[in-house]
Amino acid sequence: MRNCCLRQLGRIDYASALEIQEQLAASRKQGTAADHLLLLEHPHVITLGRNGHLENLLAGDDILERAGIAFFPTNRGGDVTYHGPGQLVGYPILDLRDWKRDVGAYVRALEQAIIDTLGDYGIEAGRIPKLTGVWVGERKIAAIGVHLSRWVTSHGFALNVSTDLSYFQYIVPCGLTKPVTSMAALGVRASLDEVGERFTRHFARIFDFEMLPGASLAAA
């Protein structure tokens, strides 16, 4: 069993969280840091993946500014997505050489951890063939977009817990016309801390981690 450091960052702006990811990823590549799982919540922000299309952003700068939504192009996979209050965001910084050198298996493992977490609340979630993310019927409840460099991961997932879904009106989520949903919209009331704790348990089981709290850990 390997060690993974859990860092709960609370509500943090996208740029600051990205800086933390980049610092940890650089240290992980150098072998001076352990694997990490960052759990957090963002203020309103729309991000565009490296393969994204601007036409899936349905609002101009003036509209986004009035709505209080920041915009960031990123190097993660996927298209356009929204992050905001009430959404559990997870950024694993992992060296997949210590697990499986298979990005597809990694994404499926993240999806499974989310599916199992939702199952704890009686929500029957699953996958849609050839699409990334976690779905309840035809509605997306969690988005996944990752980045790998020398087999070290960054970026990750966003699970709609009590997200205000009206903010998705400004985008075509992940470039798909399918609707979105949240745990709250499905009648489940839960705090981000509680959902994060349950996710962490499933994440640790699937990746065979012992989760250790703290700001930073040397590589095990």
Curated annotation (Swiss-Prot):
InterPro entries, per the entry: aa-tRNA-synth_II/BPL/LPL, BPL_LPL_catalytic, Octanoyltransferase, Octanoyltransferase_CS
Active site feature: C174 (acyl-thioester intermediate)
Domain of life, source organism: Bacteria
Main location per the UniProt record: cytoplasm
Known pathway: Protein modification; protein lipoylation via endogenous pathway; protein N(6)-(lipoyl)lysine from octanoyl-[acyl-carrier-protein]: step 1/2
Site (Lowers pKa of active site Cys): K140
Example GO molecular function: lipoyl(octanoyl) transferase activity
Entry's Gene Ontology cellular component terms: cytoplasm
Localization terms from the record: Cytoplasm
Domain BPL/LPL catalytic: 31-211
EC number of the protein: 2.3.1.181
Keywords (A to Z) from UniProt: Acyltransferase, Cytoplasm, Transferase
Keyword Cytoplasm: yes
Substrates-to-products reaction catalysed: octanoyl-[ACP] + L-lysyl-[protein] = N(6)-octanoyl-L-lysyl-[protein] + holo-[ACP] + H(+)
Function per UniProt: Catalyzes the transfer of endogenously produced octanoic acid from octanoyl-acyl-carrier-protein onto the lipoyl domains of lipoate-dependent enzymes. Lipoyl-ACP can also act as a substrate although octanoyl-ACP is likely to be the physiological substrate.
Note: In the reaction, the free carboxyl group of octanoic acid is attached via an amide linkage to the epsilon-amino group of a specific lysine residue of lipoyl domains of lipoate-dependent enzymes.
Family recorded in the similarity comment: Belongs to the LipB family.
The protein, known as: Octanoyltransferase
Organism of origin: Solibacter usitatus (strain Ellin6076)
Gene name of the record: lipB
